[in-house]
Swiss-Prot record:
The lineage of its organism: Bacteria, Pseudomonadati, Pseudomonadota, Alphaproteobacteria, Rhodobacterales. Its EC number is 2.5.1.75. Keywords: ATP-binding, Magnesium, Nucleotide-binding, Transferase, tRNA processing. The gene is miaA. Substrate binds at residues 19-24. The keyword Transmembrane does not apply. Monomer. This is tRNA dimethylallyltransferase. Catalyzes the transfer of a dimethylallyl group onto the adenine at position 37 in tRNAs that read codons beginning with uridine, leading to the formation of N6-(dimethylallyl)adenosine (i(6)A).
Length: 291
């Protein structure tokens, strides 16, 4: 799958693409051929609980090549783009050529464009936001945002809206205002080989469905069962596609076939959002058309 373009062995490589497009295999191929370290840029693959459901590299794959930032955060832990950037900075200091791979666009934009130093909001603000969202709903929370922020974030994403609402309430400044004060990037795009995978939609949909079937065979239901006792849908780790659907099955709320169908649909919808994000935000990246 190596792209038909030169990749200097000492130059950092960035690989972005939608779920199930073959990003990890390409990263491993590059590191296996030229050396370096595979660095995770997927917000769900950082969690220790979802090796199967997040499609993390297998134990054997991680042992065969250097890997960083995979499965090192506990399921109930909070992990942000800021945490990720600090850990990537530490990886860069190791001196190995990084091949940074994943599907979380915010991580890549933070890496190559910089990340605003937005203060953490106190726990009591999170509780206030939770209560407001439950009482008034997402549309009311959106209405409270400043216009600049409302025009920049995904207003259909409750987590993004709530984060912006909390920042505005806690600091008196909108999230967009904080982001305007962004510092220098850790790894400017011009210093990298930046690749974005552009798979055919139908080809990708077939791969998504087939991969989830393989996840079920590999034990995805057992992974979800481990999380069942203290399942909290509000946790960032609970956004792993397939986890809410399988937990619903384990609670008796839907059949296994219904859960699998819902997870496949959620994966295809997520891939569509990723493709849109990459198309709009990664116009300076080199495209690799698939298949």
């Amino acid at each position: 799958m190596l792209p038909p373009l030169p990749i200097p062995p000492d130059r950092p490589v960035l690989i972005a693409g939608p779920t199930a497009s073959g990003k990890s295999a390409l990263a491993a191929e590059i590191v296996g051929r030229d050396g370096g370290v595979v660095v995770n840029a997927d917000a769900l693959q950082v969690y220790d609980c979802w090796r199967i459901l997040s499609a993390r590299p297998s134990v054997a794959e991680e042992a065969a090549l250097p890997h960083r930032l995979y499965g090192h955060v506990p399921r109930r832990g909070i992990y942000s783009a800021g945490h990720w950037l600090k850990e990537v900075e530490a990886v860069l200091r190791e001196g190995l050529r990084p091949v940074i791979v994943g599907g979380t666009g915010l991580y890549f934009s933070s890496l190559t464009n910089g990340l605003a130093d937005i203060p953490h909001t106190p726990p009591e603000m999170r509780h206030e936001a939770d209560a407001f969202l439950a009482r008034a709903g997402l549309s009311a929370m959106v209405a409270d945002l400043d216009p600049a922020t409302a025009g920049r974030i995904d207003l259909r994403n409750p987590a993004r809206v709530q984060r912006a609402w909390e920042v505005l309430r806690a600091t008196g400044r909108g999230l967009a205002d904080w982001q305007a004060a962004t510092g220098a990037p850790l790894l400017p795009l011009a210093e990298t080989v930046a690749l974005v995978l552009r798979p055919d939609r139908d080809w990708l949909a077939e791969r998504i469905d087939r991969r989830f079937d393989l996840m079920i065979e590999a034990g995805a239901l057992e992974e979800a069962r481990v999380a069942l006792a203290d399942w909290d849908p509000a946790l960032p780790s609970s956004r792993a596609i397939g986890a809410p659907e399988l937990v619903a099955h384990l609670k008796g709320e839907r059949t296994l076939d219904e859960a699998i169908a819902a997870a496949k649909l959620a994966s295809r919808q997520y891939a569509k959002r990723q493709r849109t994000w990459f198309r709009n935000r990664m116009r300076d990246w080199r495209e690799i058309r698939l298949p």
